[in-house]
């Protein structure tokens, strides 16, 4: 329905179909962002490339003439679980936009949402897309101060103030972009565009891998923008104009302005900034105004960005559906007055702090703590408790962490900081949290470090070893996207049947080369067929049903192999006529004995062989099937997969009909090679036939142990570009972690490697390289880390000092049901700090007729 009595009610773009239930709420957001993306500025207002070249040449921001970098902004805010992620999915489907996340976890959450509906490219962080590099992590922020008091009504002053603050990073980005120049591919496209008048430059992202993401569109989506300082907004706008000016894009020529779509909750998050003070070896952590609060609370900025028309608020917590609990969360989110009714409702969840910190209580619950130190203390207590219980299933074992420190760089560091008496032990204690590439390294229960000193290739080094405790069969997360090799499956027959009936595995692992995914599952099916016969040897099964099961298994196997052999025989004959029968003939031989070979078999061997074949308890499948050849490809792989899948399904139906849940819930284990587990040690004969993939920081894994079996595809990969530490780290011979994912697939994970480069007085020092396993426990975590997660059971231990209401809101809103919430205190009955200053502006927006609301 496009028209009704002359009034347009709906518009549906031809290029997309949306869920009708989502269309009404999202359509106006799409319309408004599309309208903003069409706005343009005059050539005089458009920042020229020469201005960015001046930034690249300048030694300080004082040398750069002030100018405005035009942009537009659109806000999408709402309480936890209100549907903001669904909105991102709709916008990505309907608009040509650059979709990003503020953090790696936020980006992965967006990717998970998008890839659940269709094939999605990887989603990067906004830092990655605007040009932030690892070398910028140690940049000194705020080294330059804007020389005058910024006029709140002046966008130029606001942006130049951010430029001064973020100078080292933005200057380096500009310098690298300008030095790199315009690629030859783009020069050719520009030439073609000038000659033909057709938009050839729009094809640049598809022709050059080095094409910056920000030239693809002038609409940039940032999820979880509430954790970013306001200077990042200027950095994104700066980078968009820089890249588009250099690449001479059509949007730049037309004066189109970037539209930054900021998504998140300003009441949940803080923008934190950490600065390391070398003179005192201390971390200085401070709160910064985040992007969302900056735009909402600054009346001048809100007016300049016409925020009333460019803001949508999502309401209602769809994650937690209990009405009373939802009302309390709304009061936290929107700054409503907290009354005695709210406090009484939360009283029911309060238990003693000692109860929450007792590892023997609330098994399987996730503990949330205020600090990394609290997490570490709890994990140490948990490990001690498990060691005392001597549990075989939840056994505590240790994994090594190695750090190599360059003594030459360490001596230089002492010289530059004026700390000539600084010891390696003191330096390590102060920098432990900076050496790794993830904050959860501070949560680990580790031993006292051990120091070894040596020389390699003429360079002196210190090798520091610590052991981190982990719990076998516990839930963990990975802290970085690293390679994994999937080599098996552990679960139940029902679990594997569900994998075969769905396409989740093939969507996740078969986007680039679906043949690999089919070959891998075919290998698991081949190895796992014997499991049906193993199940029938389970003690306590009714003998009459066991006998019937053997007969049915033999019948379905014989029928399917006969039908398959006949089909392949026909195909082989047809192939012989067309000259392509060699491979088909080999396929036909895969399901029958070789007649020529039978002449070499003795009578005694034939008696044994045929005697076995008449025994129903022997699996005739393995006597009549040859494993898929290594050089098979294309249709041949799919044919074998399809045949094995049908055989598994028919066997599954036969046994589930006889034994019901006893069978479907029975263990099913299969691997591409031989694999066995003894405590925390996994013994694997071969990884050949496994499928290569990547871990995800948003996925939960079960820790199955470690293996020292060589993984050929991982060899030396981590040591590329780290020549000074490579020889030392190779000698450590670290084991690799084995995990299983939520679907039951078992993988071996590559090591996590990080290089620590420190910046002292403008000089970069290659200080250290650390290799560990990059995993952290899901049994306990900080409240900050839990943000964005939906957890089943949560026990919160708030800090005893003054509690911030936004911290309490983040922690409590993690649960999917308030029945599984416990807290050491009621936040409303403590001396809390009301950090919801932005809420008054949100309440005013709710009353504004121009601000859009989505329920």
Curated annotation (Swiss-Prot):
The keyword 4Fe-4S does not apply. Its EC number is 3.6.4.-. Keywords: ATP-binding, DNA replication, Helicase, Host nucleus, Hydrolase, Nucleotide-binding. InterPro entries: DNA_helicase_dom, HSV_HELI, P-loop_NTPase. It holds the Pfam family Herpes_Helicase. GO terms for cellular component: host cell nucleus. GO terms for molecular function: ATP binding; helicase activity; hydrolase activity. GO terms for biological process: DNA replication. The keyword Protease does not apply. It is found in: Host nucleus. ATP binds at residues 78-85. Associates with the primase and the primase-associated factor to form the helicase-primase complex. Belongs to the herpesviridae helicase family. Component of the helicase/primase complex. Unwinds the DNA at the replication forks and generates single-stranded DNA for both leading and lagging strand synthesis. The primase synthesizes short RNA primers on the lagging strand that the polymerase elongates using dNTPs. Possesses helicase-like motifs and therefore may act as the helicase subunit of the complex. HAMAP family: HSV_HELI. This is DNA replication helicase. The gene is HELI.
